[in-house]
């Protein structure tokens, strides 16, 4: 990464604001924090306020583990917090100053095709979710929290 951090994993550490859209269903805003829990693992925690399309407002939280690949600075794995099972394995490539990775996760009959895009002050995650009863997109934009990073 170009901001003096040596890996994608290290670049993600810190405090973030987030804005999320779940196509046709909801929007969410909130905060996320990525912090080290050991030399190879960071914990991602988010707290959001969700506005459903029908007008109801809820709050929610989510957690993942980010595991670095020590010998490959552009690679990392995302694990579910509750089980430490693999969600997605990412191999970022730099294209014109932007770092991108894509991955797929299959859960039963549902498929999550994901794209991760990082630049110097923000990152995006886009999930296309498809299955027998699912067909929507989840798009989240993260920006460094003021004074962070």
Name every feature range the model reports, one short phrase each.
Residues 2, 6-146:
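Soluble ligand-binding/transfer domains with enclosed cavities or grooves
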Residues 149:
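Short terminal or interdomain "cap/linker" segment that borders an active site or interface and mediates
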């Amino acid at each position: 990464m170009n901001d003096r951090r040596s890996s994608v994993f290290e670049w993600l550490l810190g405090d973030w604001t987030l804005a999320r859209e779940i196509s046709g269903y909801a929007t969410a805003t909130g905060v996320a924090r990525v912090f080290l829990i050991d030399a190879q693992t960071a914990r991602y925690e988010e707290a959001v306020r969700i506005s459903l399309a029908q007008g109801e407002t809820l709050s929610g939280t989510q957690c993942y583990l980010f595991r670095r690949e020590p010998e490959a600075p552009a690679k990392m794995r995302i694990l579910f917090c509750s089980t430490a099972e693999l969600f997605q394995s990412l191999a970022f490539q730099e294209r014109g100053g932007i770092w991108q990775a894509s991955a797929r996760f299959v859960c039963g009959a549902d498929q999550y095709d994901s794209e991760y895009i990082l630049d110097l002050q923000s990152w995006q995650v886009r999930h296309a979710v498809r299955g027998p009863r699912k067909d929507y997109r989840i798009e989240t934009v993260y920006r460094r929290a003021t004074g962070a990073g």
